[in-house]
């Protein structure tokens, strides 16, 4: 038996406390913690205010699990098309040893400021094998 586990350390946000993904889900949706204004025509770095670690879990013998850190990716959800935003670096590659804050660079391609609402989900974390 082997599987992928994602540890999320929220820094003040409670959005992830009861979040459970189902078998077959492509990734884990990320919630914006606050209202964020992205100025028109600008690129900015947005902080999700979480730290994460993804591990590949193997059962090495009955009942004994071994966790090996693995890299993961930050990608846009398909619903981002409804906004003027796009991920500035297309795909964010997060190394297996990175333990800093999870952030995303976004471009606002509109002629108007765009407001990201708290709890809005425009990005997700996925395993590279997807």
Language model segments and positions:
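DUTPase catalytic domain/fold
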Residues: 1-130
């Amino acid at each position: 038996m082997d599987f992928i586990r994602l540890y999320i350390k929220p820094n003040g946000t409670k959005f992830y406390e009861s979040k459970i993904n189902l078998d077959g889900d492509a990734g884990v949706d990320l919630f914006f913690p606050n209202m964020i204004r992205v100025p028109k025509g600008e690129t900015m770095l947005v902080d999700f205010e979480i730290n994460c670690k993804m591990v590949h879990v193997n059962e090495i013998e009955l009942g004994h699990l071994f966790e090996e850190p693995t890299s993961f990716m930050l990608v846009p959800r398909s619903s981002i098309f409804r906004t003027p935003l796009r991920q500035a670096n297309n795909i964010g590659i997060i190394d297996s040893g990175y333990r800093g804050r999870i952030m995303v660079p976004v471009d606002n391609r509109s002629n108007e400021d765009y407001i990201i609402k708290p709890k809005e989900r425009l990005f997700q974390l996925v395993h590279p094998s997807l």
